[in-house]
UniProtKB/Swiss-Prot annotation:
The keyword Transmembrane applies. Belongs to the dicarboxylate/amino acid:cation symporter (DAACS) (TC 2.A.23) family. The chain crosses the membrane at residues 4-24, 43-63, 74-94, 145-165, 183-203, 220-240, 242-262, 301-321, 325-345, 346-366. PROSITE patterns: NA_DICARBOXYL_SYMP_1, NA_DICARBOXYL_SYMP_2. The lineage of its organism: Bacteria, Bacillati, Bacillota, Bacilli, Bacillales. PANTHER family: PROTON/GLUTAMATE-ASPARTATE SYMPORTER, PROTON_GLUTAMATE-ASPARTATE SYMPORTER. This is Proton/glutamate-aspartate symporter. GO terms for cellular component: plasma membrane. Its main location: membrane. Catalyzes the proton-dependent, binding-protein-independent transport of glutamate and aspartate. It is a multi-pass membrane protein.
Amino acid sequence: MKKLIAFQILIALAVGAVIGHFFPDFGMALRPVGDGFIRLIKMIVVPIVFSTIVIGAAGSGSMKKMGSLGIKTIIWFEVITTLVLGLGLLLANVLKPGVGLDLSHLAKKDIHELSGYTDKVVDFKQMILDIIPTNIIDVMARNDLLAVIFFAILFGVAAAGIGKASEPVMKFFESTAQIMFKLTQIVMVTAPIGVLALMAASVGQYGIELLLPMFKLVGTVFLGLFLILFVLFPLVGLIFQIKYFEVLKMIWDLFLIAFSTTSTETILPQLMDRMEKYGCPKRVVSFVVPSGLSLNCDGSSLYLSVSCIFLAQAFQVDMTLSQQLLMMLVLVMTSKGIAAVPSGSLVVLLATANAVGLPAEGVAIIAGVDRVMDMARTGVNVPGHAIACIVVSKWEKAFRQKEWVSANSQTESI
């Protein structure tokens, strides 16, 4: 069943691209259908994240264990982010996508509305404070996952502290999680339709011809994402004894959905379910995967480092090695704000450009082709979340390798 859905999604991507290219108006008219699919998934995210984290935190039994898990998770996120940013800098310096570019003939997109969010990205104190919710209902309504995770951990640890009195509540959350996973299976039946509509709308709105003047930038980003998928992640697999290509095969349909929707939230419930079935403990899955949506965006990190060097080259700003390393340090911090604001990657790019003295007006040029790069980098984030989950599980000595049976293993009959 999973293979069938993956095949259907692949066909939907191709058909959607054809519709958008040859019938752009009709393709754009399909946007509400795709947006409806994304909304169906997003309505599940907060209940499933909150319930699974409460169960996992209560099962750990102490704040010390959850703290240890959190520290290991953050360390891994920072290590892999630094490696990816370094790869992006290397590629941009070697391939020089911005050198010789005629800026006068390039389409620019209005990014004025994004400038209001840049202060939020670089205000690190506020970013930390925002993790602590003043109103749990408010952060749930806004899908603020880091704040939801924080409250859920405290709730779960407190529940463990009162012993048997918390059993009715724990049963409620266990049932809630099971219901949400079942609801996810039902919603995923509509995935091919949603993917087709979103692809048709994207190609219809932006067109393929928009890519031609910016081919070197798009090509450099795509090459970097390819190297992450098929060089960096396999090396991580060798070091940590992870069957990477087995994992990639297991989540391939989720990769395609994230690619077409440009949102990893749309695959969060399914990814959590599969990682648990693959052998990662619930307490690790429920913490690492949701927090990774904000803190572990490998594809987005590569895009940011390549784009910053592209801006410097396009506007003939000579950046020394020390300046590039400083920029990478800034990106390590600012990239954690990607999920906190609309058009996250563009906002982070704009904030970083301002911080390191690059011409911010160049972001308007990149914004014109951002959609196609957004699709690719979002897809690459998915195996990054899966790898992080397994690495942390092994670090916790809690990974139990299970035989992954592709046929009907997680998509039950509805």
